[in-house]
């Protein structure tokens, strides 16, 4: 699947944001292994329903490090890899792993029903939360994150793939977007950078 659709544009935007952050960097600021996007003007608060049908806002998770990832349950590679890395990172954090909340936003609300989404996401970690909206709501939230989602028709209406941007967004406990983690960075990068956010909060 072409899950890196549009990543060249996003990479440019993130590089610009990182450069601006670097110009104002405190010499004592944490040295992250992923991209520091502190001060970025995207990825603001949103509301979607969780897999139990309860409305959730990003701001509901202040006090924890919130980790936002867009994907879908039929994803063959990027999504299970990223969720596995996050589950491993949380284990590496030990007791501090309880202060991390992973939010998986489905890019395929047509097939990812609440039941399907819950079964999939909690298989990686029972504390992970899956979020879904209508196709229109999903498109709106994706746009707010500069995430590109494209449905590719298959052999029938239920057999298709979804291209989606593959990075992960990490918020500090105060609710500020701080990091963009590119696909394939690995569990150790997640664990290292999340630990720094928890320590500095």
Per-region residue spans from a language model:
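Hydrophobic beta-strand anchors of alpha/beta hydrolase catalytic cores
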Residues: 67-68, 102, 168
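Structural microenvironment flanking redox-active thiols in thiol-disulfide oxidoreductases
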Residues: 81-141
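A short beta-strand-turn-helix
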Residues: 46-66, 90
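Sec/Tat-exported extracytoplasmic proteins
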Residues: 65, 72, 90-97, 121-124, ...
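N-terminal targeting signals for export/organelle localization
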Residues: 1-49, 197-201
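Short active-site neighborhood of thiol/selenol oxidoreductases, capturing the structured segment around
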Residues: 59-82, 86
